[in-house]
Amino acid sequence: MGTSAKMQKYDRQVRLWKAEGQNAIEKSHVCLLYANTVGCEALKNLILPGIGSFAVVDDTSVDFSMDGMNFFIQYDQEGKSRARCTASLLQQLNPNVEMEYLEMSPEALIDKNIEYFSKFSVVLSSNLKEKPLFRLEEYLRSHKIPLLHFNSVGFAGILRISTHEYTTTQSQPELPQDLRLKNPWPELINYVKSMDLDNMDSSSLSEIPYIVLIIHVLLKVSPAHAQNSQEADDCAMFRKIMEEYKGKCDSENIEEASSNSWKAFKEYKLPSNVYEVLHDTRCVKIQEDSESFWIMAHCLKMFYDETEFLPLSGLLPDMNCSTQQYVKLQVIYKEKSENDILKFKKYVQQTLKRLNRSVEEITDLEIKHFSRNCLNIKVMDFKTMKEEYQPTSNSVLESSSIDSNSLLPWYLAFRIYDTILEKHGKNYKEAFSDTTKTISVAQSFLSQIGLEKFFDVVYTAIQELERADGHELHSISSFIGGIVAQETIKLLAQQYLPLNNTFVFDGVHSRTETFKL
């Protein structure tokens, strides 16, 4: 498929994650362990956006008593390989996506050939037993491959994300724009001074961008480039001058300048997400094998330490002004941004040489992208499931007070549910046939984590899972699969922030909640 045809096909999603995000998705390879309904729904929502390839690993045969809700199983496929049946139908959604299937138990594959997973960009798993799950997680983390483990039973669903770390330059928060109103650079100051705003007629004044108006007033208020403009006298004088302009020219740009004047009195400060990255040990003490993100973060810290500012993005907001004035101002901001990129590039190349690495290892495009998006950088660390499952290691659970609105009982119910199945096999009726045994396992589990006082509310959730008899409801699995796919795309494209780290859905009351466990 040609580039233009591809962009037309994926037009809507490219608007969300742009061409670079789409390219990352198209290069990705996704593996699904166990082709149950929720797993197939997750894959469906990844195949449609155009992942590069997918693999289904499953040794079970189609059983309509359990697979009847799966839209990717046909009525004449009873007893056939579930991996082959689902993989072939899933591929029909997007023939450009390559497909493979493996008729083998995921647990056996993890035990005998765990290296198989090294070729994937992300692994999706459901219904894995605890021991192979932990082993797979450890292997994937060592290869920097995200793992998404999930389940859907009856009216409830759960998702857990595990990855060694998540770094992005496109976290997409609602950050204030970096316009440097309080700290204009010489070229911007000279441009503002070149215009005689005080002697302009109202028509000419109405064409001036509010940025120019604000800096002009600041320079009048405080000749030292508004360095003392936090003082009450300066603020009062600023408001007085703005009122004079309003009286002279009652236009929208003057109103914009007044409504945005607070930005002129705000001290330059690192956003919390940037501060966390620049003070992270991985940034401060980079190593020869440090990833590109941390090398550039280290260089960003050097840039900030020297200039007391981050590189300028060069982006301007929409403003009420003439096109000619807007373009002139845009050129000044763009030139400043380009100069900051060149300065940042020097730091990157010097650092790479110091680490005995090639200066070509980080491309000019990567440097430019990082520099212009540095306000959006973010790092997230994820606790391992193995750590989470240790009875004494989870401070979130230990300090929890479960109220009527909390979905923590559902999380605990899923943990106990999996424990019972692991002890008594995957025959649901057999595993939950003895109520006394179920109660005993639940009490023991809650006692280990100090939450035995919440037995009643947790046991109610367990009974709801039992009532499903191991079956999935398509509407619930479709929803959970959509969430899994959404979070997977974030991880693949390295855009936006994935949930950290557990998502729980209660379909009975249509409620969701996330926990950092």
From Swiss-Prot:
GO MF annotation, one: ATP binding
Pfam families to which the protein is assigned, alphabetical: ThiF
Main location: cytoplasm
Entry keyword annotation includes Cytoplasm: yes
Metabolic or biological pathway: Protein modification; protein neddylation
Keywords on record: ATP-binding, Cytoplasm, Nucleotide-binding, Nucleus, Ubl conjugation pathway
CDD domains in alphabetical order: APPBP1_RUB (cd01493)
UniProt KW Cytoplasm keyword: yes
Gene Ontology CC annotation, any one: cytoplasm
UniProt record, GO biological process: protein neddylation
Similarity section: Belongs to the ubiquitin-activating E1 family. ULA1 subfamily.
Record function comment: Regulatory subunit of the dimeric uba3-ula1 E1 enzyme. E1 activates NEDD8/ubl1 by first adenylating its C-terminal glycine residue with ATP, thereafter linking this residue to the side chain of the catalytic cysteine, yielding a NEDD8-UBA3 thioester and free AMP. E1 finally transfers NEDD8 to the catalytic cysteine of ubc12.
Quaternary structure note: Heterodimer of uba3 and ula1. The complex binds NEDD8/ubl1 and ubc12.
Protein name listed in UniProt: NEDD8-activating enzyme E1 regulatory subunit
Gene: uba5
